[in-house]
Amino acid sequence: MRAMACVRRVRNFCIVAHIDHGKSTLADRLIERTRAVEERLQHAQMTDNMELERERGITIKSHAVCIPYTDAHGTEYVLNFVDTPGHADFAYEVSRAIAACEGALLVVDATQGVESQTISNLYLVLEHNLEIIPVINKIDLPTADVPRVLQQVEHDLGLDPASSVLISAKTGENVDALFDAIITRIPPPQGSGTAALQALVFDCHYDQYRGVVVHIRVFEGQVTSGMVIRFMSNGAEYRVEETGVFVFNLIAREALCAGDVGYLSANVKTVSDVQVGDTITDASCPCDTPRAGFRRVKPVVFSSVYPVDTDECEQLREALERLALNDASISWERDSSLALGHGFRCGFLGLLHLEVVQQRLEREFNQTVIFTAPQVQYYVFLKTGQRIVCDNPAHYPLEQEIAQVHEPYIRATIITPTEVLGAVMTLCIEKRAYQTAVNYLDQKRVELVYEMPLAEILFGFYDRLKSISHGYASFDYELIESKLTDLVKVDILINGKPVDALAQLCYRPHARRRAQAVCARLKEEISRQQFKIAIQGSIGGQIISRETVSPFRKDVLAKCYGGDITRKRKLLEKQKEGKKRMKMVGDVEIPQTAFLSVLKEASDA
C-alpha cells in the first residue's frame, strides 16, 4: 500500500445500518478478503476494539480502516471505510463518518427488513449526496426473505432493488461482487495533491505519549512530517511529527494526500485547541476557506456527575475533557451539590449515551462517579414574563413564581409486527403519546407515528418495546416543538433535610408514584442508625410519601429484674432523650449505592 496512492484508485465509504444488521461482521469480511491483517491476528468484530463494545455487542464509536484491494485485472486500490454505530443515540458518529466519504454501503438484514434506523441513516447519506449501494445481508439464514426485503428497498427507501448486492457477511458469500460494486459505483475523491492543504478533522483521541491524535480526511493538498499546520478555527499552530493511516493500529506513512483518510500527531497537549469539524491547513501557505464543519448537535438528556471522593474533582474534569475529544457530542459545565460537593452537569444524546459515558469514565479513566437521575430541558415561563431553560431540579423556580411550563416533544416512528400492534399501542398510551399516523407497510409490518414527551422515553421505554415485540420492533425519533405540561419538583427529604441530588422534575400525575418508589428504594439502601430516619417525598412543602428506617435499640432494661416500674420508666425516658439529642446532631450518610438505585428505579418506572 503506497503512502500517496493515485487519487483515482482511492475509494472512501462508510457502512451504515440499523443495529444488529451485520455492519461489523461485514467489516470483518472486507478485512479478511484483502488480508489487511495477518490471519493469526484476526478475530470477530475487529473494528469494535473498545472493551465496552464487545461486552454490549454494539458499535459505539465509528472506526476508520485502510485496506488494500487488488481487482481481477491486477489493479491496486486503497479502500478507506468507516464502520459506524447503529443505535439512534450515536447518530452523530454516523454523520461525522459520512462527511469523510464519497459512498455508503446501506446494509439491510434479509430476515428483519428495513427498520427505522435504516431510514434515518438513508436521510443522512442523502444529505451529503453520497453514492448508495444497498447491501442485503444474512441471505444464508433459513428465515431470510430476500424478495420481500427487495420490495421494501424500493417501496420504503426509494432505491432501485436491482442495484442491491446480496451477501452473507458471516460466510463471505458474494462479498467479491460487493468489492466490484465498490470499485465501479463509488466515485474516487476529488482534489489536487498540489493545492493548498485543506483537511477536515472528523475525530480525535488522546494518547498518553503523543498528546491529541487527530483523525483527518484530506480534501486538498498534502500533509507531511515536519510541516507546520494551523487549526483554522483558533489559529493554533503545531509542527507535524507523524502522519499515517488506520489499520487497527496507527501505521505511519510519509504523507497523506488529497483523498486520503488518516491521522496526524503533532504533540498537541492543549486539548481545547482541537475541535471536531475544524479545518487544518498549511501555516506557510494556508487555504482560502475552511471546510463546512458539522452541525453541532444539542444534548437532549442531562445528568450531574460527581466524584465519589470530593478531592478528585479536578481529575474528573481532565477525564471529561479528554473524553469529549473522542466523543464530541457530550457537553459539560461545572455544577455543585450540598450533598455531593463539586461536580459537572453533562448533556447526552440519550440514555444509552449516558450509560456508555459513565462506564467509559470508570474503565478508561479510573473515575468512580455518581450520576444523578437524568432530566430533559424544560422551558419555564415566569409570571414576570421571563423565560428560563431548566434541566436541573436544583435551579427550578418556586411553584408560585411559575406561569406555565413547556416540555420537549418527539415524533416517534415505530415499525412493529402486526401481531403485537395492540400491546405496542397500549405502551405508547401509557407514555402520554398520541397517534398521528398508521401505515401498513406490508401484511406483517406496520409503521406507527406518535408524538410524545421526550421525558417518557428516558426510562424503560425502549426495553419494554423490545420485550413486548420479542425484539422485532424498531424505534426512532426526532425532536419537534415543546408543548404545555403540568410539571412539579419532587424533593426527597432525609430527616427533614432536602437532598438536592435526589430531587426530580416529573409530570404531576406521576409524582406520587415516583416519590413512593424512590423512598422505598432509599429505605433498602440507607443503613440503620441509633436514631430513627425519616425518608420523605414532598412537593412544595407538602409530604406525599414517607418511609422510616427503624433505629437500633439497646435493651436498657436488661439489668432490671423486677423492682419498681418507675425505675424502668426513668431508664426508657433517658434513652429517649439521648436518641433525640443524637438525631439533632447526627448526619445520615447516604451511600453511593443509594444514588445508583434511585437511578435504576427511575429507569424501571
Curated annotation (Swiss-Prot):
Annotated EC: 3.6.5.n1
Gene3D superfamilies listed in its UniProt record: 3.30.70.240, Elongation factor 4, C-terminal domain, Elongation Factor G (Translational Gtpase), domain 3, P-loop containing nucleotide triphosphate hydrolases, Translation factors
Molecular functions (GO terms): GTP binding; GTPase activity; ribosome binding; translation elongation factor activity
Topological type in the membrane: Peripheral membrane protein
Superkingdom as given in the UniProt entry: Bacteria
Record key words, sorted: Cell inner membrane, Cell membrane, GTP-binding, Hydrolase, Membrane, Nucleotide-binding, Protein biosynthesis
Compartment(s) where it occurs, according to its Swiss-Prot or TrEMBL record: Cell inner membrane
Primary site of residence: membrane
Gene Ontology terms: biological process: positive regulation of translation
One of the record's GO cellular component terms: plasma membrane
Domain tr-type G: 8-190
Family matches, as InterPro entries: EF-4 (IPR006297), EFG_II (IPR041095), EFG_III/V (IPR035647), EFG_V-like (IPR000640), EFTu-like_2 (IPR004161), LepA_C_sf (IPR038363), LepA_CTD (IPR013842), LepA_IV (IPR035654)
Pfam families in the cross-refs: EFG_C, EFG_III, GTP_EFTU, GTP_EFTU_D2, LepA_C
Keyword Methyltransferase: no
Record: residues binding GTP: D20, H21, G22, K23, S24, T25, N137, K138, I139, D140
Catalytic reaction(s) noted: GTP + H2O = GDP + phosphate + H(+)
Summary of the function given for this chain in its UniProt record: Required for accurate and efficient protein synthesis under certain stress conditions. May act as a fidelity factor of the translation reaction, by catalyzing a one-codon backward translocation of tRNAs on improperly translocated ribosomes. Back-translocation proceeds from a post-translocation (POST) complex to a pre-translocation (PRE) complex, thus giving elongation factor G a second chance to translocate the tRNAs correctly. Binds to ribosomes in a GTP-dependent manner.
UniProt-listed NCBIfam families: lepA, small_GTP
Family statement: Belongs to the TRAFAC class translation factor GTPase superfamily. Classic translation factor GTPase family. LepA subfamily.
PANTHER family for this protein: TRANSLATION FACTOR GUF1 HOMOLOG, CHLOROPLASTIC, TRANSLATION FACTOR GUF1-RELATED
Protein name per UniProt: Elongation factor 4
Organism: Treponema pallidum (strain Nichols)
Gene: lepA
